[in-house]
Amino acid sequence: MKSLKKKRRIQILVAAAVALVLAVGLIGYGFRDGINLYRSPSQMAENPPEAGEVFRLGGLVEDGSLVRGASETVTFRVTDGGATVPVRFTGVLPDLFSEGQGMIGTGRMEGETFVASEILAKHDENYMPREVMDSLKEQGVYQEPNS
C-alpha cells in the first residue's frame, strides 16, 4: 500500500514539473518578439545592437535636424548629449513631436541609421519618458522643466 502511494506521489510531482516547464516555455515563446530593449544613443555607441535586432531608441530630437521629405518620410537625429544617432521614419509623427523634445522610437538599425517603425512623443510640455530622463541625467545634460 505504501509503495502505491509513493508511486502516485512521484507521478504527480513529475507531471507538475513537466507542466511547469511547458508553461515557462510557452511564456518565453510568446514574449520572444514582444520584448524590446531600451537603448540611449551613448549605449548604442558603446555596444552596437545585433543586425536585425528590434529595440527602442530614446533621447532628445536634436535641434535643426528635422527634415520632412516629399512623402511621409522624416529624418532627424536623436541625442543624449554624449552621442547622436540618425533616424528615419515613414509615417505620421505624433502631434507633440518636435525638435528639442524627448522621444522613443521602436525599430532596427540599417547601416548607421535607426529605421523606426513607431515613434512616441511626450504627453505634455513637462513629460519625459523615464528611460530618456535617466540616460540624460547619466550624461549630465538633463534640465528640470521650467528651469
Swiss-Prot record:
Keyword Membrane in annotation: yes
Give me the residues that bind heme, please.
H123, Y127
**Keyword terms of this UniProt record:** Cell inner membrane, Cell membrane, Cytochrome c-type biogenesis, Heme, Iron, Membrane, Metal-binding, Signal-anchor, Transmembrane, Transmembrane helix
Main subcellular location = membrane
Top-rank lineage group of the source organism: Bacteria
Q: Which GO terms describe its molecular function?
A: heme binding; metal ion binding
Listed under GO biological process in this entry are:
cytochrome complex assembly
Where do the coiled-coil regions begin and end?
none
According to its UniProt record, where is this protein located? Cell inner membrane
Q: Which InterPro entries match?
A: CcmE, CcmE-like_sf, NA-bd_OB-fold
The UniProt family comment states:
Belongs to the CcmE/CycJ family.
What does the UniProt record say this protein does? Heme chaperone required for the biogenesis of c-type cytochromes. Transiently binds heme delivered by CcmC and transfers the heme to apo-cytochromes in a process facilitated by CcmF and CcmH.
Task: Please identify the protein, giving its name as recorded.
Answer: Cytochrome c-type biogenesis protein CcmE
Organism encoding this protein: Paracoccus denitrificans (strain Pd 1222)
